[in-house]
Amino acid sequence: MLHYTEFIADFMNRYDYPAEAIETFTRVLKRLDEEKEFGDKMDKLVEGYMYPWPDNMQEYLNGVIELSKEYDENECTLDFIFLLLCTPIVYERYKERGIPEETYWDTMADLRCKLIECIKCEEVPGTFVAGWYNGFFKLERFAYGRFQFEECTYDFNFDFVTKAGYRLTAGQKTIGFHIPSSGVPLTDEVRLDAYKKAYQQYKHLFPDGIMYFWCGSWLLYPRHKEFLPEKSNILKFMSDFELICWSEAENFHDAWRIFDKYSDLPVDQLPTDTSLRKAYAEWLRAGNKGGSGCGVIVFDGEKIIR
């Protein structure tokens, strides 16, 4: 297998990868081409995972860890190389399934999000969440507008009845969605556009025309209302949902999403250079906790039903 290909070079440029990342990834890809044993071992991992269909991803990522040690490459970087080498295979599978090429490029944009997160948190080009891509490569998770969506089920052991009287029960079909760290503001227009696009893709699963979007995220932490600015897009995003449950913990596990590499600092040393960081730093310094929530949106294709 040729590793540094025109497809992968164009892939990195299409998403405007940082120069340092392109330089690092190009070096490693060319090394795989030049060092046959190294390249063959990587090929075995990529092909073992992708054929006949993606499965047991962690098994192959464990192999990447061993390669990183054997060939003295950063684990996060080599994980990303593994993902890059999967992308042209995924591209062909989109074509085979008749999935629009635009959807492929929109969906694969997530790799840049994770790349930037890794640079900000680990100070190295790569990814520290390579396993996240199993859903993408199995053609189960797709980007439609600002968000990423996939088929899910309501998996709580209690029923939930919305304000409009819709009941969710264990095992009921829902559409889960995720919020990539693309930096695109969560405005009313952007959110509604994503819901409408996803509705068109999944409406065949909901014969009565009513779709249930489900999300679990730190963004749905209900106490945001106590300390985020009134006009915050996070609060607007939260207002789309009916909250099913929420929790908070002494150890704010999602702090890295806000503070990047500084998330492990004492609270009195957390940076305050953005409005979100400032609000969170002040909240945590006052002895409060961070948390997350799970919620549902009832959608009829045009509007949220409340």
Model-derived features with residue positions:
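Non-catalytic substrate-recognition and accessory regions of acyl/acetyltransferase enzymes
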Residues: 1-186, 204-212, 226-306
